[in-house]
């Protein structure tokens, strides 16, 4: 498989399901329903212990935008160090200014810190909330990031094909472009062929029923429209089908 395939997961069951499908890298998160947040240190350790492929930890301290305070940046530094201590291979991060540009002072500090620890760095879909993709691409390249996860500044990668193609052409091999959001086995061939991206990203999510025998109806642990007894997990077949499509 010449095209790298990354799977994002947010629980240990999904780690095993994803690896069984045959991807080349794991993006380790919590709360994928919120776009992916930093996983716990325990989850990082378990992933490092059990994974047979590289694992990159999401470094995102909260949901919402990517304009962070100094305290949040310090928190992210600690989480990067935790990823290293846990034995992971890299981290996934992104930092913006209030006006939608890459926050170069903060991004430089975080990337240099991670790289000094020997960790690879992916710049995540904060890129898709930038005001100027061409400028942002050059800045992320200057940070020494290995890749950018992007939908081409669109709601989904299939909708961002033209921008993805332009970014690949602008990059000229200086950084990998990884297409993500709405990518599946049915459309990945077209996306790769038209854009020439070298990496793709998906969750391959499904749900399974709870193994509980007592289904509590009297309370909710979160939002009223979320079923506490329907567990989101990675679908091994969805990953395997993607691998087949890429081959």
Swiss-Prot record:
Alphabetical list of PANTHER family matching this protein: COPPER HOMEOSTASIS PROTEIN CUTC (PTHR12598), COPPER HOMEOSTASIS PROTEIN CUTC HOMOLOG (PTHR12598:SF0)
Q: Which SUPFAM superfamilies match?
A: CutC-like
GO CC annotation terms, alphabetical: cytoplasm
The name this protein carries in UniProt is PF03932 family protein CutC
Q: Which GO terms describe its molecular function?
A: copper ion binding
Name the protein family.
Belongs to the CutC family.
Q: Which Gene3D superfamilies match?
A: Copper homeostasis (CutC) domain
Location relative to the cell = Cytoplasm
In terms of one coarse class, where is the protein primarily found? cytoplasm
Sorted UniProt keywords: Cytoplasm
**Intrachain S-S bonds:** none
InterPro entries according to UniProt: CutC-like, CutC-like_dom_sf
Give the matching HAMAP family: CutC (MF_00795)
């Amino acid at each position: 498989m010449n095209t790298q395939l990354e799977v994002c997961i947010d629980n240990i069951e999904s780690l095993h399901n994803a690896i069984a499908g045959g991807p080349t890298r794991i993006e380790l998160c919590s709360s994928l329903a919120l776009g992916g947040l930093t996983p716990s240190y325990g989850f990082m350790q378990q992933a490092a212990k059990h994974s047979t492929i590289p694992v990159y930890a999401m470094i995102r301290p909260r949901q919402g935008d990517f304009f962070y305070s100094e305290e949040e940046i310090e928190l992210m530094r600690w989480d990067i160090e935790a990823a290293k201590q846990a034995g992971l291979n890299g981290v996934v991060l992104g930092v913006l200014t209030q006006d939608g540009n890459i926050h170069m002072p903060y991004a430089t500090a975080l990337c240099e810190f991670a790289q000094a620890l020997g960790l690879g760095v992916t710049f995540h879909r904060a890129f898709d909330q930038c005001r100027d993709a061409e400028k942002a691409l050059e800045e992320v390249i200057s940070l020494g990031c290995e890749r950018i996860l992007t939908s081409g500044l669109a709601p989904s990668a299939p909708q961002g094909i033209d921008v993805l193609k332009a970014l690949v052409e602008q990059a000229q091999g200086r950084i990998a472009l990884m297409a993500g959001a709405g990518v599946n086995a049915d459309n990945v061939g077209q996306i790769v062929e038209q854009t020439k991206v070298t990496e793709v990203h998906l969750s391959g999510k499904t749900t399974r029923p709870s193994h509980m025998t007592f289904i509590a109806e009297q309370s909710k642990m979160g939002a009223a429209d979320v079923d506490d007894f329907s567990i989101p997990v990675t679908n091994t077949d969805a990953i395997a089908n993607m691998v087949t499509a890429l081959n």
